[in-house]
A protein has these predicted regions:
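Intrinsically disordered, low-complexity boundary segments flanking structured domains
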Residues: 27-31, 50-54, 87
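Rieske [2Fe-2S] iron-sulfur-binding domain
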Residues: 74-163
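Hydrophobic membrane-insertion alpha-helices, especially the h-region
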Residues: 9-22
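Conserved small/polar residues in nucleotide/adenosyl-binding loops
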Residues: 1-5
Length: 163
């Protein structure tokens, strides 16, 4: 019986020792505070007027925040899905029709598109000629997909939390 107790105690001490030695190695793989701070960002949009857009950085990438006019919203909703290279309804891209939030990175080769340009009054990528509409959907050019919509939410009527 005495040998069994020594064996059990030795096993417990060994497991605890391995766990104590492994914990710092495993813990170093967690993101540090600076990375966690970049996970979300809050943007005050109270000064953005209809028809205007702003660009903010999130995780090192530009994010376009556009306050669309009634005309832009109507134009985006009127587009038939059969006309789109990457079909997506405007309602699925903008939780609040007045506000469009999307990554400002062309889905072709990662250039930054220009706002209020191109054949569809949305965005135009000067690198290779992709044209996006007022909902950020690819309409013409080499880009394979629409401009990406990040996870976001309205904290209140004047603040958008991205991430």
């Amino acid at each position: 019986m005495y040998k069994r107790q020594i064996y059990t105690a030795s096993t417990v001490v060994g497991v605890v020792g391995v766990g104590a030695a492994a914990w710092p190695l495993i813990d170093q793989m967690n993101p540090d505070a600076s990375v966690k701070a970049l996970a979300t960002t809050e943007v005050d949009v109270s000064l953005v007027k209809p028809g205007q857009s702003i660009t903010v950085l999130w995780r090192g990438k530009p994010v376009f925040i556009k306050r669309r006019t009634e005309n832009e919203i109507t134009e985006a909703k009127a587009v038939s899905l059969t006309e789109l290279k990457h079909p997506e309804k405007d309602e699925d891209r903008a939780s609040n029709p007045e506000w469009l939030v999307m990554l400002g990175v062309c889905t072709h080769l990662g250039c930054v598109p220009l706002a209020d340009k191109g054949d569809y009054n949305g965005w135009f990528c000067p690198c290779h000629g992709s044209h996006y509409d007022t909902s950020g959907r690819i309409r013409k050019g080499p880009a394979p997909t629409n401009l990406e919509i990040p996870k976001y939410e309205f904290v209140n009527s004047n603040t958008i939390k991205i991430g």
